[in-house]
Amino acid sequence: MKFCYNCGTALSGTEKFCGQCGARIEHKPAPPVHGVSPVPSSETSAHVLREQDQEVKARKCSRHGVIFTNISALARKFGTDRKVLERLFEQYADGMASADIDYRLADASDYIFRSKGAGRKSDRVSLGERATWVDYQHILYDIVCLEREKGLPESNYLFIIGGHDIVPVPAINHYINDPELGDDDIETDLLYAYPYGPHTQSALESQQLYKQEMYFLVGRLPVPTDADVSYLANYLQNALDVRGGVPVTKVYSQCDPHWKELTAHLMSPYNELGMLPDRGNISGRFCYGNVLLGPEITSEHIASVMEKDTDLIFLNLHGSDRPSDSGYCGEFPPKTHQYHEIFPTSAMRIPQRYNIFVAEACYGGRFIGYDTLRSMIQSGLAHKTVIGLASSRIAFGMPSPPASSADVICATFVIGLLTGYSAGEAMVLARQSFFGEDGILSDTGATTLAEFNLFGDPSLRAAIALDSSKSARKLSRNIAPKDFPIGYETKVIKSGPTGEQSLLDRVRSAVDANIQAISNAIGKELYAQYGLAPREPQTIKRVKYANGQERLLFSYSEPSDGSAYSVKTLWRVTTSTDGKIESVLTSK
């Protein structure tokens, strides 16, 4: 009789893993791989076994993907043996094969480069704490090159396991260069979708990367600071339970009252299908079009109004980057710029069905350095959320219809899911919607494309179609059409502190004499429609787009006033050069 070398449990002799501790049971040494000497011990890294499996006996699946992590770092974080994690990933890959996706593991803590194109064939690496996202991207580039060199099926899905301390989150320079913004960069996993080298960062910052074909559809399972291995096991089991599709029958939607018309508009397709609970018996103070309103429905009431069988959560509320502000908030009383918690992280534990979570809030998808209770997305993923979409930075949207920026990417993502696309495909569809007939991608639009990240397994789908005639079709892997005129030149007319002379006084001497009148008209509109007291714009810019069109951009800010939550509201007003207001965007 054989015994597990790790825990001593008796074995029958045929097991691949110990049923007690999860340790891999080796019955014979693994054969060498392409001239690379085997590890000089009884262990062989999981990525080598899976790569051999793919070349010799690939699963009969039409979809292929990579589970990407750093097992050594993950094992240290969880305080567990790496073999336990290898077993979890192997079981997950086996289970997901029945959903027509063949996942293989790429472990950055024990990886052998095997392609010619990556330039490091036979190099064995173990990425540590000092490794950057570029080092991790190089591993993905090796996978891409190997698949192309050997004619293997393309692994179009990339499922990242771990937070910034496990697989670094790339950051790019921010597109919006306004001093009042406060953010200098954007954290985005989008660079892992294009594993072609460090130049992809500058290509994304110039927005030209959107014209290139992406290789991976990326989703990430971040790991909270307070998590143990049960967090990972729980999510993987949840995802396996819905591998055939996440049932979506009941929607919970809540918004700040200033955005009620827009949110009700976005939710109207699901309202017509009866997916939003009928709240006709609730006063208009609390509800609009079956969408609950923030100031009246607060964290104290969530448990009594959020149904336990909710399977899609759509929130259009404010978020904060202050570490102590864990939940989402709303303005209360209206037009006072005072913000209070409306939707706490604990609310993510109310639904007892597997669910999809979508949030427009600023910093709604923050997770780096946060525990479960301080991160909304991690709180959901620790419970029943299997797919999530949220932003890493300040997000912008329209106060009222038509939709723009965060409203568009979130609403289109949901439509994509509910018309048969996988989560990763729905993310592509949502980003493609920004390249429309007007031929313009603004700095706000570019920010939205990068800052919204997908959470969870990107291969998962919803189990409902809004309209069978609109079932999922094959998508282009280019976010932007190759002939789309991307780019813009910005001339700052005035910016920053006003000094002794007011900004508007100095604007009077600007080349465009009508800017003073335009600014006055904007001030009246903001006060009449949104209660924003008259003030000077902090920034005025003239923007010339690659298609030849020109716009004026006025930026304003309104700090919170004595709020329990730290929320600075930003306004960005775009006009034609003759002063016609085209859009009014506000931060979420």
Q: Model-found features: residue ranges?
A:
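Preferential activation on post-signal-peptide N-terminal prodomains/segments
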Residues: 474-516, 561, 585
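Catalytic cores of nucleophile-dependent amide-cleaving enzymes
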Residues: 165, 186-234, 316, 321-413
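Active-site-proximal C-terminal subdomain of hydrolase catalytic domains
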Residues: 112, 165, 360-483
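Cys/His-rich metal-coordination motifs, chiefly Zn-binding "fingers/knuckles"
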Residues: 1-35
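Structured catalytic cores of large enzymes
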Residues: 43-102, 110-277
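Short, non-transmembrane alpha-helical segments in secretory-pathway proteins
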Residues: 499-545
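Exposed beta-strand-loop-beta-strand "reactive/processing" segments of non-cytosolic proteins
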Residues: 534-576
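Catalytic-core segments of thiol-dependent peptidases
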Residues: 110, 116, 143-168, 251-370
